[in-house]
Amino acid sequence: MKLILTADVDHLGSVGDTVEVKDGYGRNFLLPRGMAIVASRGAQKQADEIRRSRETKAVRDREHANEIKTAIQALGSVALPVKTAADSGKLFGSVTAGDVVAAIKKAGGPNLDKRIVRLAKAHIKAVGTHPVVMHLHPEIEVELSVDVVAES
């Protein structure tokens, strides 16, 4: 059975690929789940258009990610004032990815989604300088140092 994939399928192909599979696999698995459509000339044209638009979007996303990376690198580091427990340097709570994003925006950086921020540990729980990695695109990531300082 000849099919055109509408979703990425492991060990078979990616969106827009024309593949030859056994009838049962196509009829009972791929077609009911919407992962493929039966190959025809019209369907092939539609799949080619979808593939071209995705490639164009991927290039735009990569360019946008590079712009954000440049803006974040221009910041160098970001200060994040927090309340501390006495003089020990431990925090009353913890610094999360959302707090880091808010500090970047407050410092004049771009507005980011907190899901792209990767902390070395789940939360920052002490005063000091901590590295933070942001995954802007599958191919692009940027590192920023966050200075957690005691609020006065």
Curated annotation (Swiss-Prot):
Keywords: Ribonucleoprotein, Ribosomal protein, RNA-binding, rRNA-binding. GO terms for molecular function: rRNA binding; structural constituent of ribosome. PROSITE patterns: RIBOSOMAL_L9. It comes from the Bacteria. Pfam families: Ribosomal_L9_C (PF03948), Ribosomal_L9_N (PF01281). One of its GO terms (cellular component) is ribosome. One of its GO terms (biological process) is translation. Binds to the 23S rRNA. Belongs to the bacterial ribosomal protein bL9 family. This is Large ribosomal subunit protein bL9. It comes from Mycobacterium ulcerans (strain Agy99). The gene is rplI.
